Amino acid sequence: MHQPLHAINNGDNGGNCVPVKYLHHEPLPNPLHPEREDYSPNLHQIWDTEIVERDMEISNPHRYADELDEKFRAESASWEAAGIQVDNWAWEVHERAETEVYDAFSVKIPIEPDVKPKGCSDNNHIGKRQFEKHLTVDEAYQSRAAKTAGKGLAEAGVRLAMILNEAAKSNP
C-alpha cells in the first residue's frame, strides 16, 4: 500500500498507462500487442522497482534498510504513536500519489478518480494520449521520488511491524 501508485487509479491504471522516458530509456510499445497501447517503461513500473533499485545502487538491500531506519528514526516514533489506522494510511499514500508522483511533472497529468479503464487502449486511448506528452523522469524527479519511496518503505516497515505485533498479542 505504501507505493503511491498502488493507492490511486487516476484513469490510467495507477500509472501503468503513463509511458515515461526513464533517464535514458525511451518508452517502447509492447511488441507482442501494440494494440493494447501499453509501454515500457511506464510510471507504475519505475515506482515499483527502478527508483528504489537505482537509489540503493551503491549499497546492498540490508545496508539500504539500515540507512532508511537511521534516516527516519525520529519520524518512526510518531508513526508508532499514531497507532494502526489503515484507512488513514491509504488516504495519506493516495494524496502522496497526487502531489509527489503526478504533480511532479512539468506537463500536468490531470487527476481523474472516477475513470477506471480495463487497459491502456480504454479511456479514449489513455496510453497513446499519455505517450504523446513525452513525459521524462530526469535526475531531479528521480532524486525527489527516491526520497518519497524511501519514506514509504520506512513507513511500511514500521506499520507492518505494528500490525504483526498486535496480531501476536491477540494470538499467543
Language model segments and positions:
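C-terminal accessory segments of proteins
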Residues: P4-P172
